[in-house]
Amino acid sequence: MKVTLIAILTCAAVLVLHTTAAEELEAESQLMEVGMPDTELAAVDEERLFECSVSCEIEKEGNKDCKEKKCKGGWKCKFNMCVKV
């Protein structure tokens, strides 16, 4: 009984991991296709740049030095821009 339960749980875990990995691979392959517009990625980059610049400008107006904003997703604020770390 225990062996059967362990086998079922193991198979379920492998299936979930395989499905997740397959979805990630499919998403990466779609992003890497030649000729596919990168408008969605460009929009995200522009949004991060805008958020960071606005944050720094607000801090400067308050007579404070511009502190690094915590940009999300592996990005970091430098020179009023979010740059990839």
From Swiss-Prot:
Q: Which UniProt keywords apply?
A: Disulfide bond, Neurotoxin, Postsynaptic neurotoxin, Secreted, Signal, Toxin
Which residues pair up as cystines?
C52-C66, C56-C77, C71-C82
Localization per record? Secreted
Against Pfam families, the record matches this protein to: Toxin_20
| Tissue/organ expression | Expressed by the venom gland.
> Which GO cellular component terms, listed alphabetically, does the Swiss-Prot or TrEMBL entry include?
extracellular region; host cell postsynaptic membrane
- Residues that make up the propeptide removed upon maturation: 23-48
Extent of the signal sequence: 1-22
Gene Ontology terms for molecular function: toxin activity
Protein family per UniProt: Belongs to the neurotoxin 12 (Hwtx-2) family. 02 (Hwtx-2) subfamily.
Its annotated function is as follows: Postsynaptic neurotoxin.
Q: What is this protein called?
A: U4-theraphotoxin-Hhn1i
Natural source organism: Cyriopagopus hainanus (Chinese bird spider)
